């Protein structure tokens, strides 16, 4: 396999690098900074999307439509202890929100143990404030209570359609009923602030916006509509399939009347709105209105590659450093250097291209599975 990711420094080489701006020590004993670390664009680090597995039990046409994929070697996946160490380092440099992703995270057999070690860090004075997970919901009915017991705070479920026939067409699986059962199980388990993520594709499900809002309201959740994104490969993305934020608001305005935009207080990607009856929903317009300028998000693949951007073509291999003996403080140094060098504005650069070609061809993705969006939390 062609390696395009740059290994992080490990072993003796790391001793040449010192933390020069340490001002305090966290509860975990890690050196931290009094002032936030900023990248070259002035953005701080706050949100980590942590993939725990690259495999998925669906084959959604906008994400991973092919029958077979080159999976990451199982021995390369970060262990629970390795995840805990790396998470400590991320918290020490400013991460206050962590979201577990996949692939499909509920496939991983030791997911509960991962949740337990991370949830124990939430609210302990370290700075971590939130732990959430994104799932396709297929396995959720059987695992919702287990996730709650392990310490999961919030759940986001992907739900693009309420029609079983459309679900099968987009996911290539007949498990729509399991997703609905999973959503109901989340409410029964006592979760609140639940989100339903719906990728809106022109000519496919753009006629279901109000139905999805009503469904979300009935299950005590909030729907977030997502513009169809270009993730490359065999997805056959094209700009003419994008149903834009403006078009969504126009469609919903005709149905419900005046829609009020809600104030935005953080760097979350969704813009939130309120209907006349008080129902709220969100729109993530990452295709037509990229949020690169305020993006505080980075990604960690299931095998420990740290990516500064969803569209990054290279990253830093934290797994190699940890397995070579790096401590959490060593990882802190790697993160500090890496974030200060960050200048990624991937979605803005894609938007600026006059002719939108496929992000990455299938042939290149087959050579390096790290470039697949499903390995980096999509």
From Swiss-Prot:
Any single GO BP term: Mo-molybdopterin cofactor biosynthetic process
Chain's role: Catalyzes the cyclization of GTP to (8S)-3',8-cyclo-7,8-dihydroguanosine 5'-triphosphate.
Pathway(s) of this molecule: Cofactor biosynthesis; molybdopterin biosynthesis
Self-association state and partner proteins as the record states: Monomer and homodimer.
Cofactor(s) this protein requires: [4Fe-4S] cluster
Gene (UniProt): moaA3
Protein name listed in UniProt: GTP 3',8-cyclase 3
Principal EC category: lyase
Record text on cofactor binding: Binds 2 [4Fe-4S] clusters. Binds 1 [4Fe-4S] cluster coordinated with 3 cysteines and an exchangeable S-adenosyl-L-methionine and 1 [4Fe-4S] cluster coordinated with 3 cysteines and the GTP-derived substrate.
InterPro entries: Aldolase_TIM (IPR013785), Elp3/MiaA/NifB-like_rSAM (IPR006638), MoaA (IPR013483), MoaA_NifB_PqqE_Fe-S-bd_CS (IPR000385), MoaA_twitch (IPR010505), MoCo_biosynth_MoaA/MoaC (IPR050105), rSAM (IPR007197)
Catalysed conversion reaction: GTP + AH2 + S-adenosyl-L-methionine = (8S)-3',8-cyclo-7,8-dihydroguanosine 5'-triphosphate + 5'-deoxyadenosine + L-methionine + A + H(+)
GO function terms (MF aspect): 4 iron, 4 sulfur cluster binding; cyclic pyranopterin monophosphate synthase activity; GTP 3',8'-cyclase activity; GTP binding; metal ion binding; S-adenosyl-L-methionine binding
EC number: 4.1.99.22
Family: Belongs to the radical SAM superfamily. MoaA family.
Source organism of this protein record: Mycobacterium bovis (strain ATCC BAA-935 / AF2122/97)
HAMAP family according to UniProt: MoaA_B (MF_01225_B)
Residues binding [4Fe-4S] cluster 1, per UniProt: 56, 60, 63
Keyword field: 4Fe-4S, GTP-binding, Iron, Iron-sulfur, Lyase, Metal-binding, Molybdenum cofactor biosynthesis, Nucleotide-binding, S-adenosyl-L-methionine
Binding positions for GTP per the UniProt entry: 49, 99, 134, 195, 297-299
